[in-house]
Amino acid sequence: MRRGVRRIVPLTLGWADLPLDVSIFGAPPDARLREPVPGVLLLCDGGWLLLDTGYNTALITDPVLRRRYHGDPLVQPLLPGPGEPLPDALAGAGIGLDDVHAVAVSHLHYDHAGGLKHFAGRVPVHVQRRELAYGMSGGPEPERNGIFQVDYDDPRITWRQADGDAEIAAGVTAVLTAGHTPGHQSFVVDVDHSAGGGGFVFACDAADLTENIDGELAVGGFVDVPPEETVVQIRKLKCLAAERGYRLIPGHDPVAWPALTSDLATRWPPAA
């Protein structure tokens, strides 16, 4: 019998205060919301797999770096406390950095790839080949689109590059959902029968909000494609979830993410 994931631990690694039209194309420009910045821990054969890594704290806490990288007053990152969000969140779940055996990033935006510094020289990092190529292409365009080379241009990182859909661990499949960025990937997670079965589809930034999914509304951020292409990816994920009977999780929803966190804490209570 095919093995699956035995436990899922959602992490909240910060928040972003931003205009709604960052997440929904064509939303009223004066509408705003505070979105969570998630990470997901998956207990797989061999150890924990981490999906996404949150912010690079130094780019927020250092005043000079903050002006350099987060100077837009309309889009502001928020940290959960004075420490390092990722190690602190892992510790809160009773997990150390050394317990993480692999990392996968949905894409290289600063709120997803900023914590890769914790894993350089330690574990493999899964990414789509076209995403990494775009991020390493040089020139000003990637940074204008929220991809900061300082987060991931480290020769110590061991990349595992995929060309399209790929199984990255038993029960975890990366699904290419390009549009938001050139190599964005979402994740289909199959839960092992011993842990209750079923599963989830984590859209990541292919669909920020429940409104993107239910209304098939284009996301507000996209690179080198028309906004309608992001709706194609939303429909693809909806079909995948429906075929499997899985719950489709939006990437930054301020209601859906806390609800999932609560639901999974009930299903898999934290260790005492």
Language-model segments: what does each one mean?
Residues W15-D88, S186-D205:
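Conserved beta-strand hairpin/beta-sheet module of binuclear metal-dependent hydrolase folds
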Residues P29-L33, V175-H180:
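Short Gly/Pro-enriched turn/cap motifs at secondary-structure boundaries
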Residues T53-N56, L108, R130-E131, H180-T181, ...:
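Active-site metal-binding loops of divalent metal-dependent hydrolases
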Residues T61-P80, L209-V223, A265-A272:
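Active-site gating loops and adjacent loop-to-helix segments of metal-dependent hydrolytic enzymes
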Residues L78-D111, H118, P124, Q128-L176, P182-T261, ...:
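Metallo-beta-lactamase
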Residues V105-H107, H184, W257-A272:
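Short, electropositive alpha-helical surface patch
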